[in-house]
Amino acid sequence: EPLSVAVHATVAQGRVSALQNVLVLGAGPVGLLVAAVARAYGARRVVCVDLVDEKLAFAQSFCATSTFKPSLPQQDESDSECARRNALALLDSLGGDVKENDGFDLALDATGAQPCVQLAAWAMRPRGRIVLIGMGRPEIHVPITRLLVREVEVLGSFRYAAGDYDRSIALASLGMIDVTRIVTHRYVFSDAEKAFDATTAGRGDDGRVCIKVQICQGAAAA
Protein backbone atom coordinates (compact mmCIF):
# COMPACT_ATOMS: atom_id res chain seq x y z
CA GLU A 1 0.00 0.00 0.00
CA PRO A 2 2.73 2.58 0.79
CA LEU A 3 4.39 1.73 -2.51
CA SER A 4 1.11 2.45 -4.32
CA VAL A 5 1.02 5.86 -2.63
CA ALA A 6 4.56 6.49 -3.87
CA VAL A 7 3.77 5.30 -7.39
CA HIS A 8 0.69 7.53 -7.60
CA ALA A 9 2.65 10.59 -6.44
CA THR A 10 5.76 10.00 -8.52
CA VAL A 11 4.38 8.50 -11.73
CA ALA A 12 0.75 9.60 -12.05
CA GLN A 13 1.07 13.08 -10.52
CA GLY A 14 4.78 13.82 -10.84
CA ARG A 15 5.11 12.28 -14.31
CA VAL A 16 8.71 11.38 -13.55
CA SER A 17 10.85 10.57 -16.56
CA ALA A 18 14.34 9.31 -17.30
CA LEU A 19 17.31 11.61 -16.63
CA GLN A 20 15.33 14.03 -14.47
CA ASN A 21 16.77 15.48 -11.28
CA VAL A 22 14.41 14.72 -8.41
CA LEU A 23 14.25 16.17 -4.90
CA VAL A 24 12.46 14.18 -2.17
CA LEU A 25 11.59 15.89 1.10
CA GLY A 26 11.33 13.45 4.01
CA ALA A 27 13.06 10.08 4.41
CA GLY A 28 10.26 8.17 6.09
CA PRO A 29 8.56 5.15 4.48
CA VAL A 30 6.67 7.13 1.84
CA GLY A 31 9.57 9.43 1.03
CA LEU A 32 11.96 6.52 0.65
CA LEU A 33 9.57 4.66 -1.62
CA VAL A 34 9.00 7.82 -3.67
CA ALA A 35 12.76 8.09 -4.14
CA ALA A 36 12.97 4.40 -5.05
CA VAL A 37 10.22 4.78 -7.66
CA ALA A 38 12.02 7.78 -9.17
CA ARG A 39 15.22 5.73 -9.44
CA ALA A 40 13.32 2.79 -10.95
CA TYR A 41 11.91 5.11 -13.61
CA GLY A 42 15.37 6.31 -14.59
CA ALA A 43 15.87 9.60 -12.73
CA ARG A 44 19.44 10.88 -13.07
CA ARG A 45 19.69 12.23 -9.53
CA VAL A 46 17.48 11.51 -6.54
CA VAL A 47 18.31 13.68 -3.54
CA CYS A 48 16.67 12.88 -0.19
CA VAL A 49 16.30 15.58 2.46
CA ASP A 50 15.80 14.94 6.17
CA LEU A 51 16.96 16.19 9.57
CA VAL A 52 17.79 12.74 10.99
CA ASP A 53 21.27 11.46 10.15
CA GLU A 54 20.30 7.78 10.44
CA LYS A 55 17.44 8.24 7.98
CA LEU A 56 19.74 9.95 5.52
CA ALA A 57 22.24 7.11 5.83
CA PHE A 58 19.46 4.61 5.16
CA ALA A 59 18.25 6.62 2.17
CA GLN A 60 21.76 6.68 0.72
CA SER A 61 22.02 2.90 0.96
CA PHE A 62 18.48 2.28 -0.29
CA CYS A 63 17.66 4.64 -3.13
CA ALA A 64 19.23 8.10 -3.05
CA THR A 65 22.09 9.25 -5.23
CA SER A 66 22.86 11.80 -2.51
CA THR A 67 21.34 13.29 0.63
CA PHE A 68 21.05 16.70 2.22
CA LYS A 69 20.54 17.77 5.83
CA PRO A 70 19.18 21.34 5.96
CA SER A 71 20.31 23.68 8.69
CA LEU A 72 17.85 25.17 11.16
CA PRO A 73 16.78 28.85 11.05
CA GLN A 74 19.33 31.32 12.32
CA GLN A 75 18.43 34.04 14.80
CA ASP A 76 15.67 36.31 13.44
CA GLU A 77 15.57 34.31 10.19
CA SER A 78 12.12 33.37 8.85
CA ASP A 79 11.27 29.86 7.66
CA SER A 80 11.19 31.07 4.06
CA GLU A 81 14.56 32.82 4.35
CA CYS A 82 16.02 29.68 5.88
CA ALA A 83 14.51 27.56 3.09
CA ARG A 84 16.01 29.85 0.44
CA ARG A 85 19.44 29.67 2.09
CA ASN A 86 19.26 25.89 2.30
CA ALA A 87 18.11 25.61 -1.31
CA LEU A 88 21.07 27.68 -2.51
CA ALA A 89 23.43 25.58 -0.39
CA LEU A 90 21.94 22.39 -1.83
CA LEU A 91 22.29 23.52 -5.44
CA ASP A 92 25.85 24.71 -4.81
CA SER A 93 26.79 21.39 -3.21
CA LEU A 94 25.42 19.36 -6.13
CA GLY A 95 26.73 21.49 -8.97
CA GLY A 96 26.53 19.94 -12.43
CA ASP A 97 23.30 20.03 -14.38
CA VAL A 98 21.20 20.73 -11.28
CA LYS A 99 22.95 24.06 -10.79
CA GLU A 100 23.20 24.74 -14.53
CA ASN A 101 19.43 24.22 -14.87
CA ASP A 102 18.89 26.45 -11.83
CA GLY A 103 17.08 23.77 -9.86
CA PHE A 104 15.36 20.40 -9.85
CA ASP A 105 12.93 19.12 -12.45
CA LEU A 106 10.66 17.48 -9.90
CA ALA A 107 10.22 17.75 -6.13
CA LEU A 108 8.02 15.51 -3.99
CA ASP A 109 7.24 16.47 -0.41
CA ALA A 110 6.39 13.58 1.90
CA THR A 111 6.35 15.65 5.11
CA GLY A 112 3.64 18.28 4.89
CA ALA A 113 5.97 20.54 6.90
CA GLN A 114 6.07 24.21 5.93
CA PRO A 115 9.91 24.48 5.82
CA CYS A 116 10.09 21.49 3.46
CA VAL A 117 7.46 22.84 1.08
CA GLN A 118 9.26 26.17 1.08
CA LEU A 119 12.59 24.47 0.38
CA ALA A 120 11.01 22.70 -2.58
CA ALA A 121 9.71 26.01 -3.92
CA TRP A 122 13.15 27.63 -3.75
CA ALA A 123 14.93 24.60 -5.22
CA MET A 124 12.85 24.25 -8.40
CA ARG A 125 14.02 25.12 -11.87
CA PRO A 126 11.75 27.27 -14.05
CA ARG A 127 8.66 25.26 -15.08
CA GLY A 128 9.52 22.49 -12.65
CA ARG A 129 6.88 20.46 -10.83
CA ILE A 130 6.17 20.02 -7.11
CA VAL A 131 3.99 17.20 -5.79
CA LEU A 132 2.63 17.51 -2.25
CA ILE A 133 2.02 14.17 -0.53
CA GLY A 134 2.47 14.74 3.20
CA MET A 135 -0.32 16.18 5.30
CA GLY A 136 0.77 18.66 7.95
CA ARG A 137 -0.98 21.79 9.13
CA PRO A 138 -4.11 22.74 7.18
CA GLU A 139 -2.57 26.09 6.20
CA ILE A 140 1.05 26.98 5.46
CA HIS A 141 2.95 29.91 3.94
CA VAL A 142 4.69 29.46 0.60
CA PRO A 143 6.82 31.87 -1.49
CA ILE A 144 4.06 32.36 -4.04
CA THR A 145 5.92 34.97 -6.10
CA ARG A 146 8.76 32.52 -6.60
CA LEU A 147 6.32 29.90 -7.87
CA LEU A 148 4.48 32.33 -10.14
CA VAL A 149 7.52 33.94 -11.72
CA ARG A 150 9.07 30.55 -12.44
CA GLU A 151 5.77 29.03 -13.59
CA VAL A 152 6.25 26.12 -11.20
CA GLU A 153 3.44 23.57 -11.27
CA VAL A 154 2.15 22.47 -7.84
CA LEU A 155 0.04 19.33 -7.55
CA GLY A 156 -1.51 17.39 -4.70
CA SER A 157 -1.35 13.62 -4.38
CA PHE A 158 -3.82 11.66 -2.23
CA ARG A 159 -3.43 7.92 -1.69
CA TYR A 160 -3.62 5.99 -5.00
CA ALA A 161 -5.84 5.36 -8.02
CA ALA A 162 -6.59 2.74 -10.68
CA GLY A 163 -3.45 1.10 -11.99
CA ASP A 164 -1.17 2.15 -9.13
CA TYR A 165 -1.34 -1.23 -7.39
CA ASP A 166 -0.52 -3.00 -10.67
CA ARG A 167 2.53 -0.80 -11.20
CA SER A 168 3.61 -1.35 -7.58
CA ILE A 169 3.31 -5.12 -7.82
CA ALA A 170 5.32 -5.06 -11.04
CA LEU A 171 8.11 -2.97 -9.50
CA ALA A 172 8.34 -5.30 -6.50
CA SER A 173 8.01 -8.58 -8.39
CA LEU A 174 10.65 -7.58 -10.94
CA GLY A 175 13.06 -6.78 -8.12
CA MET A 176 13.29 -3.11 -9.04
CA ILE A 177 12.29 -2.07 -5.51
CA ASP A 178 12.89 -4.22 -2.41
CA VAL A 179 10.05 -3.10 -0.16
CA THR A 180 11.15 -5.42 2.65
CA ARG A 181 14.20 -3.27 3.35
CA ILE A 182 12.21 -0.39 4.78
CA VAL A 183 10.73 -2.65 7.50
CA THR A 184 13.30 -1.99 10.20
CA HIS A 185 11.35 -3.39 13.16
CA ARG A 186 8.93 -6.32 13.49
CA TYR A 187 6.77 -7.17 16.50
CA VAL A 188 4.46 -10.07 17.25
CA PHE A 189 0.81 -9.17 17.78
CA SER A 190 1.09 -9.59 21.55
CA ASP A 191 3.71 -6.81 21.52
CA ALA A 192 1.55 -4.43 19.49
CA GLU A 193 1.76 -1.78 22.21
CA LYS A 194 5.56 -1.83 21.97
CA ALA A 195 5.26 -1.45 18.21
CA PHE A 196 3.12 1.67 18.55
CA ASP A 197 5.47 3.05 21.22
CA ALA A 198 8.43 2.54 18.88
CA THR A 199 6.59 4.25 16.05
CA THR A 200 5.74 7.21 18.27
CA ALA A 201 9.27 7.50 19.66
CA GLY A 202 10.89 6.99 16.28
CA ARG A 203 13.24 4.38 17.74
CA GLY A 204 12.91 0.76 18.79
CA ASP A 205 14.10 -0.87 22.00
CA ASP A 206 17.33 -1.63 20.17
CA GLY A 207 18.02 2.10 19.80
CA ARG A 208 17.79 2.02 16.01
CA VAL A 209 15.74 4.58 14.11
CA CYS A 210 12.38 3.22 12.98
CA ILE A 211 11.64 3.51 9.29
CA LYS A 212 8.67 1.15 9.04
CA VAL A 213 7.30 -0.90 11.95
CA GLN A 214 5.42 -4.11 11.19
CA ILE A 215 3.14 -6.13 13.46
CA CYS A 216 3.00 -9.76 12.42
CA GLN A 217 1.96 -13.20 13.57
CA GLY A 218 4.50 -15.75 14.74
CA ALA A 219 8.05 -14.98 15.76
CA ALA A 220 9.27 -11.42 15.34
CA ALA A 221 12.51 -10.58 13.60
CA ALA A 222 14.51 -7.54 14.66
What are these regions (language model features)?
Residues 17, 112, 125, 204:
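Short conserved AdoMet
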Residues 19, 64, 103-104, 192:
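Local beta-strand N-terminus motif with an aromatic residue
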Residues 1-77:
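Mid-domain Rossmann-like dinucleotide-binding core that forms the NAD(H)/NADP(H) cofactor-binding site
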Residues 105-108, 131:
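N-terminal Rossmann-like NAD(P) cofactor-binding module of classical short-chain dehydrogenase/reductase
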Residues 97, 101, 136, 177-182, ...:
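C-terminal capping/lid region of NAD(P)-dependent oxidoreductase domains
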Residues 73-101:
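Short amphipathic alpha-helix with an adjacent loop that forms part of the alpha/beta core around
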Residues 69, 114-174, 181, 214-222:
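Glycine-rich phosphate-binding loop and adjacent beta-alpha segment
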Residues 29-34, 113-119:
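Short glycine/serine/threonine-rich phosphate/pyrophosphate-binding segments
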